[in-house]
């Protein structure tokens, strides 16, 4: 049996007024933010789900339930650190992450390197192990109409 395992994560959040927009641990100036129990960092949530999926540990809703007040407005970077600690506890390390943000706006290219570094720091890996891309849906669907943002992530982990 191989020591490598792969996981896929997907998350979506609605855009609303009166909330900050946090993506990859970066507060991005924008007229709307993402609605959610935590900071609603859709990109980091997809990454956490990919990591948890790779080790068959469920998803972030199982580990950090949205009906638990302890996680109200909590930083997803803090939760990502907890996921990293869990991976280490069960004997896995991150090989690489490949994440894609789906958003018509705002453009995230100016923030991409900081996002990568934030995730690398939280996971205790080199920034070269973190890939973050962004795309639009050409004004189609809920992300294209500006109703929300979505993210996919794939994680490769290795048993130690």
Regions found by a protein language model. Give the residues of each.
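N-terminal charge/polar-biased segments
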Residues: 1-4, 158-160
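RNase III-family endoribonuclease catalytic core
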Residues: 2-114, 122-123
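Glycine-rich, charged/polar anion/phosphate-binding loops
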Residues: 7-9, 138-141
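Short active-site-adjacent structural elements
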Residues: 109-110, 139-143
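Active-site phosphate/pyrophosphate- and oxyanion-stabilizing loops and adjacent acidic/basic residues
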Residues: 117
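Short acidic capping loops at alpha-helix termini that bridge into adjacent secondary structure
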Residues: 126-129
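Pyridoxal 5′-phosphate
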Residues: 132-136
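C-terminal edge-of-domain segments
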Residues: 143-160
